[in-house]
């Protein structure tokens, strides 16, 4: 009897201890969530960008792999869709080099569903992963052995779904299918992967641009807005800077990591200051990485460990380069006194030779070079009907030692425009003049050069300025260039220099404080008194108050700052624990237990200098 009583008391004591532990954990979680809710308060934060500008617009994302969509559009596509855009996400390959197509495609659909985008908005072209298909080499799927497009169980590849047959794995067929899917849906906006250091990113980028060349030359009335983005340098391999007092914007990759360190980006003609910066929906932001919608989506890509790179991928903006599609030269007849005229209106800024894989790929098949002995060095552009022209854009041979130093444009009406030295890095040199009407042809003649004179592209526009189809203003920290949302300052900060990014670089804007005490605006600088706590600041485009951005600025006390620093340590720990959980889940869900154990054993062998496995 006495023994039973003792056992019951022990059980009761154990239960009490367990309940106390559970309550303690719940209390910690409640405190954590309360503090996080305070930090994440977006009351007063607002931007007009996603409200209605994409309603009834068609937006298409074109990427190589199932997860690349999150790298280039994961933070902007969901708010577009939620605000009325008709979206399509096109995956060019099955991502099936080491993992089955079914696994990759299931992960992609699950991830997009986490962002509110349904499965029926997803298209799989079904081409192989990790091959040299793009340069004409024979290709097959590493995981399935197939030599034609296919999809995993329960999915269909685009070519079979559209035409009833699978397409052979050839470069030409991939270009055909990209062209077909674009013309079938005719998107208003295309967000496409750009040429970076990944072989499939390079190949799909070039394939897309070849498809766009065909479209622009045969569909003169269809000129979608094209925004291109680097998936590796600006996301997957970017700086892991999520854990900061305020969210950081995308940073330029260190030059030594580029395909050619001579240039700012992997595409020589892109300048960092010319990038298009789209803001992030405030609802997707959090000081906890686990709360960010992008992380929740990345967590669905178990096989790729994509979630491990969230610190690099999640930023305060999404960065693109605009590629104009309205050039009059796409439907013009172009001839040259020497060189290859076909390269001058092909939409492609760069090309490759016999490989897309490996570091420092040689860029070729993109510049039309004049013969050294050619005394004329002239390009002639003839239109099929009279045009109005107000701008000619010239892209120099991007070899830094080969530059056109001067030239002249002569129009069929006899008028001439002098051309200064072109940008040596091959970036766009815009020659703008008063509109010339009834132009049927013009020539560009090189008058001075060094090295090998040549051109990458020649474009002509009716309107010098380009309308992106949307209006945007976004406040930023003028000193760091980071976009601002709910901004926290430390106790000793006395001022904050504000700037703004506008979709129209020529647009003026007005900044004003709409709420808050003990703060004043001196020019574009917020000046805080010692007793400042919080304010709300609004920026509006001059003449268009419907285009606005609104931010909050809050000062942390010394206690709050210390609390925040402790909070961030907890956040980092929670992130590490969750990534470990997801790695373990991947081992069992995708059946990688043996492979992981084998890799672990091999790592031990390498360290010990012995061989115990086969």
Predicted regions and their residues:
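N-terminal Lys/Arg-rich, disordered targeting/topogenic segments
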Residues: 1-12
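Active-site beta-strand->loop->alpha-helix modules in alpha/beta enzyme cores, enriched
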Residues: 13-20, 26-221
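The feature marks non-catalytic terminal segments
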Residues: 19-33, 45-51, 107, 111-115, ...
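Aromatic, loop-rich ligand-recognition surfaces of beta-strand-rich domains
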Residues: 357-416, 423-467
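Short, exposed coil/turn segments at beta-strand boundaries within extracellular/luminal domains
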Residues: 450-452, 541-549
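Extracellular interdomain linker/stem segments of modular secreted and single-pass surface proteins
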Residues: 464-465, 554-561
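Solvent-exposed, low-complexity, repeat-rich "mucin-like" stalks and linkers
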Residues: 469-507, 569
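Extracellular/luminal low-complexity segments enriched in Ser/Thr/Pro
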Residues: 524-531
């Amino acid at each position: 009897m006495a023994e039973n009583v003792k056992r019951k008391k022990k059980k009761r004591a154990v239960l009490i201890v367990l309940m106390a532990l559970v309550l303690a954990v719940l209390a910690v979680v409640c405190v954590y969530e309360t503090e996080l809710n305070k930090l994440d308060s977006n009351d007063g934060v607002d931007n007009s960008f996603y409200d209605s500008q994409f309603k009834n617009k068609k937006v298409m994302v074109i990427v190589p792999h199932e997860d690349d969509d999150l790298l280039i559009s994961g933070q902007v596509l969901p708010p577009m869709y939620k605000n009325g855009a008709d979206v399509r996400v096109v995956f060019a390959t099955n991502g099936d080099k080491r993992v089955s197509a079914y696994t990759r495609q299931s992960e992609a659909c699950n991830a997009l569903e986490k962002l509110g985008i349904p499965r029926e908005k997803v298209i799989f072209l079904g081409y192989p992963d990790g091959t040299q298909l793009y340069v004409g080499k024979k290709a097959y799927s590493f995981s399935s052995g197939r030599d034609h497009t296919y999809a995993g169980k329960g999915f269909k590849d685009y070519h079979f779904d559209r035409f009833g047959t699978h397409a052979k794995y050839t470069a030409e067929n991939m270009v055909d299918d990209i062209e077909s899917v674009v013309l079938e849906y005719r998107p208003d906006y295309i967000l496409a992967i750009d040429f970076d250091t990944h072989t499939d990113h390079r190949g799909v980028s070039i394939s897309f641009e070849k498809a766009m060349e065909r479209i622009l030359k045969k569909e003169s009335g269809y000129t979608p807005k094209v925004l291109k983005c680097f998936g590796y340098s600006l996301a997957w391999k970017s700086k892991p800077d999520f854990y900061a007092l305020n969210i950081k914007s995308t940073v330029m990759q260190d030059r030594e990591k580029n395909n050619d360190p001579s240039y700012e980006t992997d595409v020589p003609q892109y300048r960092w200051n010319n990038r298009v910066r789209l803001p992030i929906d405030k609802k997707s932001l959090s000081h906890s990485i686990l709360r960010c919608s992008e992380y929740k989506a990345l967590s669905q890509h178990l096989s790729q460990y994509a979630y491990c790179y969230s610190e690099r991928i999640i930023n305060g903006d999404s960065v693109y380069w605009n590629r104009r599609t309205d050039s009059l030269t796409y439907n013009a007849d172009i001839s040259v006194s020497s060189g290859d005229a076909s390269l001058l209106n092909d939409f492609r800024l760069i090309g490759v030779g016999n490989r897309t894989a490996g570091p420092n790929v040689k860029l070729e098949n993109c510049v039309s070079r004049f013969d050294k002995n050619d005394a004329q060095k002239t390009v002639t552009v003839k239109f099929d009907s009279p045009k109005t022209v107000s701008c000619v854009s010239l892209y120099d041979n991007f070899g830094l030692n080969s530059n056109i130093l001067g030239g002249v444009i002569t129009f069929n009406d006899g008028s001439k425009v002098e051309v200064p030295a072109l940008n040596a890095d091959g970036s766009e040199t815009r020659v703008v003049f008063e509109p010339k009407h009834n132009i049927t042809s013009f020539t560009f003649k090189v008058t001075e050069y060094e090295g090998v004179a040549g051109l990458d592209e020649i474009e002509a526009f009716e309107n010098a300025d380009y309308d992106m189809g949307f209006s945007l203003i976004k406040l930023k920290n003028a000193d760091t260039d980071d976009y601002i949302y709910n901004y926290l300052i430390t106790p000793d900060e006395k001022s904050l220099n504000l700037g703004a990014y506008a979709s129209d670089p020529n647009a003026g804007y007005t900044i004003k404080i709409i709420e808050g005490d003990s703060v004043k605006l001196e020019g574009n600088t917020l000046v805080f008194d010692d007793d400042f706590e919080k304010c709300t600041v609004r920026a509006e485009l001059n003449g268009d108050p419907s285009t606005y951005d609104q931010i909050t600025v809050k000062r942390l006390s010394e206690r709050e700052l210390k609390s925040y620093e402790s909070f961030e340590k907890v956040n980092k720990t929670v992130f590490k624990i969750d990534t470990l959980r997801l790695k373990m889940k991947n081992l069992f869900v995708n059946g990688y237990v043996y492979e992981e154990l084998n890799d672990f054993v091999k790592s031990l062998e390498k360290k010990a200098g012995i061989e115990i496995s086969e």
